[in-house]
Amino acid sequence: MKVAGVITEYNPFHNGHKYQLEQIKRQTSADYIVVVMSGDFVQRGEPAIIDKYERTRMALLSGADLVLELPSVFATASAEFFAGGGVSVLKNTGVVDMLCYGVESVDHELTKLVAGVLKNPPSEYSASLARLIQGGMSFPAARSRALCEYFRDTYDSASEKLDAFIASPNNILAIEYEKALMDCDITGFPIQRVGEGYHSTDSTSEFSSATAVRGVISTLIDIDKHNTITNMQLDNSWISTKFSQLIPSACADILVNCILGGHIVFPDDISEMLYYRLLTGKDKGFAQYADCTKELSAKIVKNIYKYEGFTQFCNLLKSKNLTYTRISRVLTHILLGIENNDFNICMNNPYLRILGFKKSSGELMHLLKKRASVPIITKVADAPYELISKDIFAADLYGRLCHSQQNEFTHGVVII
């Protein structure tokens, strides 16, 4: 039996994701696909647009066989910890043979070459990185420049194509995946992406990005009026037509129900909750939270009374050496109570949280129970609370945002 793994967000699931799952089956001859998916908050440091159970349903209807939750500590982290956490989950299943990931251009050798440098940084690279950061560059920009400088001096052939290669968010994740895979027996398998880029807002393509799909959703919602439909005369068929070229039909039905039911969540929906957290924590500061330096903590406190909302505050705080995404992650960590030591705690106390599976994956589920090296959680009530307390808290906050009547203790595993 051959099992492929995928680490993803599906925020939301779209045609490009379905294409990837189809290509995994076709190119690897995998019998099953195990998906490790972010829960209710995602790597950009924002709430997911629809909840994790509906996104799980989308994945299972479109080619996935088993969906596991990526703990919120890793799901909201930088690419390094996002990838490392995801690989750790796949490794702990004991059943996954390969990790398949999307790339803008398939160059597996270059990916592994760069991953090796990041895994064991040469002194030349480290010196360049430190110099560039001290010069005011953000960490992502400094890392890219330092890598280009290092490869230009050591591998001329690699340096020529490195600039374009590391400019893509998907390729950066691919590098981090390969870096994490160096510590386990799972092999990497790159899949060529099709369609629009990660940040593209073009919603006319068959393979539009998740960013573009979220943009279309936002045109149907009056965000300032608590997620009410902008035109109450809209019906299911009209909205379905809006998404017919963007996402698989089964997923479109799920998304339409979420829209009409008022279960869509946008980044600024966390604004009031976050402001409360900032006000109650300003005297102590925020340096204990993941990714937050003392300098950024001081900047947050200094500007707290200029706060108007989540995205406005992110834009207010960003600078040449602090990206919007870095700040949004920090603010989300403050909201969720994710502190610096939580990464180690989570790595040292791993678990497998099953969000959903197919009835037809009985062989896979049997093997998982036999080979998993960590606890398998299907019922939150049966799990040690301290093990998944961060995920429960994140889900409780999200449930308030999306007007859900269920919680982690009452919502069952999704079975298709």
Swiss-Prot record:
Catalyzed reactions per annotation: cytidine(34) in elongator tRNA(Met) + acetate + ATP = N(4)-acetylcytidine(34) in elongator tRNA(Met) + AMP + diphosphate
GO molecular function: ATP binding; ligase activity, forming carbon-nitrogen bonds; tRNA binding
Main location per the UniProt record: cytoplasm
Protein localization: Cytoplasm
Entry superkingdom: Bacteria
Any single GO CC term annotated in Swiss-Prot or TrEMBL for this entry: cytoplasm
Kinase among keywords: no
NCBIfam families xref list: cyt_tran_rel (TIGR00125)
Role summary: Catalyzes the formation of N(4)-acetylcytidine (ac(4)C) at the wobble position of elongator tRNA(Met), using acetate and ATP as substrates. First activates an acetate ion to form acetyladenylate (Ac-AMP) and then transfers the acetyl group to tRNA to form ac(4)C34.
HAMAP family: TmcAL
Identification of the protein by name: tRNA(Met) cytidine acetate ligase
